[in-house]
């Protein structure tokens, strides 16, 4: 029918054209997995082009949203800014500075959640090294960038984030002029208009983020500790343990590129509660009070406010046994428990109406025993009442 097919994908209409989709952006994005950063699933290279299969978000650019709707209310501005800063913090923790943060590079999904995109100007940071490249959009660029001075990297993203916050709250830019030299002077002076309707608390945050001297400029730590920013802050944005991930990833599967693409597409697009999960009525059965359903607060819960949440039930003592054996478990539904790190099988026996016997059996031990012609009945059992 005349359509072009690349790998498993059929090309549709061209939505836009960019000039920085090169190897650096590909290397950066393929490493990233964060709820507020656009995901790169796959890269297909041809002699003339590089095709990047990326996450689709339907809400368009934050810039277009502000132009159409004007300034956002303080609560909504804070929610989006918290999400953006969480993504920026993730970049910096992985030694990447974006360098071109602006509303045009922040996309919105179907639930009005922010997604940072376009890492074409990003740069990998190294300890002790400074950058000099003047890049990014002038209205959002920090004074040290437009003046050609050396900069470490993270501080320029803080400045740009401050400009985005101002745009969210005011619907305009803090520094703007059609005459570029005049615009640069305004940025280097660091003086901007603060409307009377702005909360004094957020004004203090803006002034700290838009500090001309990068040494005095707010850090992510400063912003996170600011009273205005901490209001209604979702826990998942800045977990206490940065290594924590709500998704348990099979490293072996990710080594296979086609499997990796399918794996992440399924994880990112499924409903958090699987189709195999029992209806709410199942959770009312007193026999299941010993078998917990997954009820931990997760990014997906926070990002989809319309999703009905299940009521929690009491955790079973079996979880203590699994942890004691150094296993990691994930409850898919009340009758399906996934365990990783050591290959093992679990079987649940009902002893009577109130007692169950949970049988842990090592698959490897069973295979070895069968190979030696021995009985494979040895197992670890735990009584659950």
Curated annotation (Swiss-Prot):
Domain Protein kinase residues, every copy: 1-229
Activity regulation (UniProt): Activated by phosphorylation on Thr-133. Binding of AMP to non-catalytic gamma subunit (PRKAG1, PRKAG2 or PRKAG3) results in allosteric activation, inducing phosphorylation on Thr-133. AMP-binding to gamma subunit also sustains activity by preventing dephosphorylation of Thr-133. ADP also stimulates Thr-133 phosphorylation, without stimulating already phosphorylated AMPK. ATP promotes dephosphorylation of Thr-133, rendering the enzyme inactive. Under physiological conditions AMPK mainly exists in its inactive form in complex with ATP, which is much more abundant than AMP.
Chain residue ranges for the region called AIS: 252-297
Positions that bind ATP: 15-22
InterPro entries according to UniProt: KA1/Ssp2_C, Kinase-like_dom_sf, Prot_kinase_dom, Ser/Thr_kinase_AS
Residues that bear Phosphoserine: 277, 281, 353, 383
Assembly mode: AMPK is a heterotrimer of an alpha catalytic subunit (PRKAA1 or PRKAA2), a beta (PRKAB1 or PRKAB2) and a gamma non-catalytic subunits (PRKAG1, PRKAG2 or PRKAG3). Interacts with FNIP1 and FNIP2.
PTM: Ubiquitinated. Phosphorylated at Thr-133 by STK11/LKB1 in complex with STE20-related adapter-alpha (STRADA) pseudo kinase and CAB39. Also phosphorylated at Thr-133 by CAMKK2; triggered by a rise in intracellular calcium ions, without detectable changes in the AMP/ATP ratio. CAMKK1 can also phosphorylate Thr-133, but at a much lower level. Dephosphorylated by protein phosphatase 2A and 2C (PP2A and PP2C). Phosphorylated by ULK1 and ULK2; leading to negatively regulate AMPK activity and suggesting the existence of a regulatory feedback loop between ULK1, ULK2 and AMPK. Dephosphorylated by PPM1A and PPM1B.
Protein's name according to its UniProt entry: 5'-AMP-activated protein kinase catalytic subunit alpha-1
Record keyword Transmembrane present: no
Cysteines paired by S-S bonds: none
Primary site of residence: cytoplasm
Native source organism of the sequence: Sus scrofa (Pig)
SMART domains on file: S_TKc
Record's catalysed reaction(s): L-seryl-[protein] + ATP = O-phospho-L-seryl-[protein] + ADP + H(+); L-threonyl-[protein] + ATP = O-phospho-L-threonyl-[protein] + ADP + H(+); L-seryl-[acetyl-CoA carboxylase] + ATP = O-phospho-L-seryl-[acetyl-CoA carboxylase] + ADP + H(+); L-seryl-[3-hydroxy-3-methylglutaryl-coenzyme A reductase] + ATP = O-phospho-L-seryl-[3-hydroxy-3-methylglutaryl-coenzyme A reductase] + ADP + H(+)
Family matches, as Pfam families: Pkinase (PF00069)
């Amino acid at each position: 029918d005349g359509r072009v097919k690349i790998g498993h994908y059929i090309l549709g209409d061209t939505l836009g054209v960019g000039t920085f989709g090169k190897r650096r952006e590909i290397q950066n994005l393929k490493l990233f997995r964060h709820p507020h950063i656009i995901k790169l699933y796959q890269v297909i290279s041809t002699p003339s082009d590089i095709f990047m299969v990326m996450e689709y978000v339907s809400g368009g650019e934050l810039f277009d949203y502000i132009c159409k709707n004007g300034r956002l209310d303080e609560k909504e501005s804070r929610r989006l800014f918290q999400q953006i800063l969480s993504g920026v913090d993730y970049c910096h923790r992985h030694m990447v500075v974006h360098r071109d943060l602006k509303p045009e590079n922040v996309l919105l999904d179907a639930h009005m959640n922010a997604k940072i995109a376009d890492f074409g100007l990003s740069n990998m940071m190294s300890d002790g090294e400074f950058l000099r490249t003047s890049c990014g959009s002038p209205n959002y660029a920090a004074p040290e960038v437009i003046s050609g001075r050396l900069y470490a990297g993270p501080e320029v993203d803080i400045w740009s984030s401050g400009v985005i916050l101002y745009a969210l709250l005011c619907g305009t830019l803090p520094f703007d002029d059609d005459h570029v030299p005049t615009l640069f002077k305004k940025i280097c002076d660091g003086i901007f208009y603060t409307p009377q309707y702005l909360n004094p608390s957020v004004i203090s945050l803006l002034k700290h983020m838009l500090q001309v001297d990068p040494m005095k400029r707010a850090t992510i730590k400063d912003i996170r500790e600011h009273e205005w920013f901490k209001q209604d802050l979702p826990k998942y944005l800045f977990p206490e343990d940065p290594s924590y991930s709500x998704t348990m990833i099979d490293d072996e599967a990710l080594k296979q590129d086609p499997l990796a693409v399918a794996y992440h597409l399924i994880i990112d697009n499924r409903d958090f509660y699987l189709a195999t999960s029992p209806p709410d009525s199942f959770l009312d059965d007193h026999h299941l009070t010993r078998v917990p359903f997954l009820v931990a607060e997760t990014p997906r819960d926070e990002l989809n406010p319309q999703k009905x949440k299940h009521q929690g039930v009491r955790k079973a003592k079996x979880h203590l046994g699994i942890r004691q054996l150094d296993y990691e478990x994930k409850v898919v539904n009340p009758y399906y428990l996934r365990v990783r790190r050591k290959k093992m099988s679990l079987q649940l026996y009902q002893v009577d109406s109130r007692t169950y016997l949970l049988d842990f059996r090592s698959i490897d031990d069973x295979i070895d025993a069968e190979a030696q012609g021995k009985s494979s009945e040895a197992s670890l059992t735990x009584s659950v009442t």
